[in-house]
C-alpha cells in the first residue's frame, strides 16, 4: 500500500539526485520514509536517498518495493509547477502508479523490482578529511575543471588548512583554493584523490547551489558527498570511486 501527496519541487529534487546516475531504480516505501539506493552500470558512482514521511503533505506506506523508469516519472513530475501538489497512489492489483497533478491524471506502468539491478552496499569508510562547503563553490570548481580536463583532483593541504579542486590538461591547468575562511567547516587530514569529472558533473547537476555539502575525502579512496533538501527532511549521499594512479 502506498498513497501520498508531495510538493512538486520536493519530488523533482529527489528524482534528480538519482536520475543523474541511473535510468531505473527500486523505491522502498517504508512507513517512515521513502528510500532509494542505486549504483551506475559501471559500479563507479552510487547514490543513497531518503525522504522522510514529514516531507510529504500526507504519506501512507507499508514497506513495499516498486521499480520505476526514472525518465518517465521525471517527465510526469516535470508537468507540475514548483508550487503544485502531486498525488501518488499505487494500485497493487495492476502494479501501476496513479499520479494526479492539477487535474492531469497519469497511470505509470511499473517495472518488476527483481529485474532491476541489486541495490549496492555503501561502505562505511574512515576518511581523514571532512570539508563542508556551499554547493555553489563545488559548481565553480567543477565548471573550471571541465574547461581543461576530464579528470578532477580533490585534495586537502593539512599545513595550509585549505581544500583544493584541481585539473590538469594537456596544455592548461586549473586550481581552485578554498581556505578555511572560505569553507563552512574543515577537518583537515591526509586527502588527495583523482576522479572522473563526468561523474562529478552529473552529481553536481543535482546539488542545489545553496546546499551545505559535506565532502568526506581520503588518499586514493572514494569520495562521499552529503547534502540535504526539502528543508532538511530529504537526505542524499553520493559516493564516487577514485581513479587509482600508478607510479
Swiss-Prot record:
One of its GO terms (biological process) is regulation of DNA replication. Keywords: DNA replication, DNA-binding. It comes from Halorubrum lacusprofundi (strain ATCC 49239 / DSM 5036 / JCM 8891 / ACAM 34). The gene is pcn. NCBIfam families: PRK01115.1-5. Homotrimer. The subunits circularize to form a toroid; DNA passes through its center. Replication factor C (RFC) is required to load the toroid on the DNA. Sliding clamp subunit that acts as a moving platform for DNA processing. Responsible for tethering the catalytic subunit of DNA polymerase and other proteins to DNA during high-speed replication. This is DNA polymerase sliding clamp. The keyword Electron transport does not apply.
Amino acid at each position: 500500500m502506498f498513497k501520498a501527496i508531495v510538493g512538486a519541487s520536493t519530488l523533482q529534487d529527489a528524482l534528480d539526485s538519482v536520475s543523474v546516475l541511473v535510468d531505473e531504480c527500486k523505491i522502498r516505501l517504508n512507513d517512515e520514509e521513502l528510500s532509494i539506493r542505486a549504483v551506475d552500470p559501471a559500479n563507479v558512482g552510487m547514490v543513497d536517498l531518503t525522504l522522510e514521511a514529514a516531507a510529504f503533505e500526507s504519506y501512507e506506506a507499508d514497506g513495499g518495493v516498486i521499480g520505476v523508469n526514472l525518465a518517465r516519472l521525471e517527465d510526469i513530475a516535470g508537468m507540475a509547477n514548483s508550487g503544485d501538489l502531486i498525488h501518488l497512489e499505487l494500485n497493487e492489483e495492476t502494479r501501476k502508479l496513479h499520479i494526479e497533478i492539477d487535474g492531469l491524471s497519469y497511470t505509470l506502468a511499473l517495472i518488476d523490482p527483481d529485474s532491476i539491478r541489486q541495490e549496492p552496499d555503501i561502505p562505511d569508510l574512515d576518511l581523514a578529511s571532512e570539508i563542508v562547503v556551499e554547493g555553489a563553490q563545488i559548481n565553480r570548481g567543477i565548471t573550471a575543471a571541465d574547461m581543461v580536463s576530464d579528470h578532477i583532483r580533490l585534495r586537502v593541504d593539512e599545513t595550509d588548512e585549505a581544500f583544493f579542486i584541481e585539473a590538469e590538461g594537456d596544455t592548461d591547468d586549473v586550481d581552485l583554493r578554498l581556505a578555511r575562511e572560505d569553507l563552512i567547516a574543515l577537518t583537515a587530514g591526509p586527502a588527495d584523490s583523482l576522479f572522473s569529472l563526468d561523474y562529478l558533473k552529473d552529481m553536481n547537476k543535482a546539488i542545489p547551489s545553496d546546499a551545505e555539502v559535506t565532502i568526506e575525502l581520503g588518499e586514493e579512496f572514494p569520495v562521499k558527498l552529503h547534502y540535504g533538501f526539502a528543508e532538511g527532511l530529504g537526505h542524499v549521499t553520493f559516493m564516487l570511486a577514485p581513479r587509482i594512479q600508478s607510479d
